[in-house]
Amino acid sequence: MGYRDYKEFATGEYYHVFNRGNDKMDIFHDPQDYLNFLHRLCVLLGMPRGALGIGSELTDTKLRLRLDSFDAGTFSLVCYCIMPNHFHLLLGQNGDIPISKLILRLATSYSMYFNAKYAHVGHVFQDRFKAAHIANDKYLRHLSAYIHLNPKVAGLVKTTSDWKYSSYPDYIDKREDAVCDKSLVL
């Protein structure tokens, strides 16, 4: 599958969306950064406050979240993995609002948080996000495995289930408040 900057996304289709830190810099330095990004994603997806058990764990009250969520069900989150210098999202578009609007809000919001927290000036993300259209179920399942194995392949953990910042616990029923649509993969 070719990766490119998608300008148009289609209703009922799925996409692998990813981006990394500018100059390959780490953009997630501590648990608060990972949780903040995931919390922003959940809010934008219209999930209930406290999805993924996040909210009570966020301690930085100076960096408040100011986001308008999309209606629940506008997008489907199939799986995700947040790594120190990049992120992967496997998303479905369920309506007319393009995934690009979701990612723009997510990246802008997280960049504002990151720049304020670390007194950083300039771009946080290297470029516009990249996306690949998921053409068939076989590729979708392969991509889910690729996304979940990322931390293990990178040598960050010994087992995939040890990485806290992915949807893998949703898939092995280790998270009570699972947020991903597992039906497409399992």
Segments from the language model and where they lie:
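Short catalytic/metal-binding and nucleic-acid-binding patches
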Residues: 1-179, 185-186
